[in-house]
């Protein structure tokens, strides 16, 4: 819970101070982050109340993750900004956009494939992080490096944005709200660093499913 609260508060302050948001992309990310955290909180709460290691039934946990991930995915395909950019896209890219798209057989098929792909990523990553949280400081330490990379990537996209004055259109990046995403990732790193101080072996506080599923 402390990781989620610290991250959201720091992101909100950072977004307001810099004028980067709160943006639609940032709000979607917070929704996904908090939504998965709530599922983990329910799981932890059941374990505590029933004094046993079994919390939510696995199928119930997956259903919750699919519901949150699906709403998140649909949210990325609506609400374009003033440049016509969406938080998500059906196009498949590597370092640059390619001619490949999930909508190869029509928009309806593309959206369905996009939902499946998003759910696969969210449920796989969320549960993998939960499994990683088996040693003191492991999940938090690994996540710091992961979100450190995301901070660098999103900030680089911000300074190389196609909407920047004088941007080279052949080398720029057309992504939505990269600065707000960088602020969120940086806020999460700060929250994890503070948490890691008390979670390193021998741990005095624990992440639980609340923090692990959110990450």
Predicted regions and their residues:
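Alpha-helical transmembrane segments
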Residues: 3-41, 72-91, 113-215
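Membrane-interfacial loop-to-helix junctions in multi-pass inner-membrane proteins
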Residues: 19-30, 49-64
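Membrane interface segments of multi-pass transport proteins and intramembrane proteases
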Residues: 47-57, 94-104
């Amino acid at each position: 819970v402390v990781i989620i609260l610290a991250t959201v508060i720091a992101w909100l302050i950072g977004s307001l101070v810099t004028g980067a948001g709160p943006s639609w992309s940032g709000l979607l990310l917070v929704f996904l982050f908090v939504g998965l955290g709530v599922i983990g909180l329910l799981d932890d709460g059941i374990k505590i109340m029933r004094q046993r290691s079994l919390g939510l039934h696995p199928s119930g946990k997956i259903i919750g993750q699919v519901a949150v991930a699906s709403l998140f995915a649909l949210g990325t395909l609506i609400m374009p900004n003033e440049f016509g950019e969406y938080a998500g896209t059906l196009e498949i890219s590597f370092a640059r956009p390619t001619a490949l798209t999930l909508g190869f057989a029509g928009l309806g098929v593309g959206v369905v494939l996009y939902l499946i792909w998003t759910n696969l990523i969210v449920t796989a990553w969320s549960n993998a992080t939960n499994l990683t949280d088996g040693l003191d400081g492991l999940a938090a330490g690994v996540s710091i490096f992961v979100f450190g990379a995301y901070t660098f990537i999103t900030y680089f996209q911000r300074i190389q944005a196609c909407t920047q004055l004088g941007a080279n259109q052949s080398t720029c990046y057309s992504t939505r709200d990269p600065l707000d995403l960088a602020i969120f990732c940086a806020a999460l790193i700060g929250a994890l660093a503070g948490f890691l101080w008390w979670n390193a072996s021998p741990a005095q506080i624990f992440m639980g499913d609340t923090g692990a599923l959110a990450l």
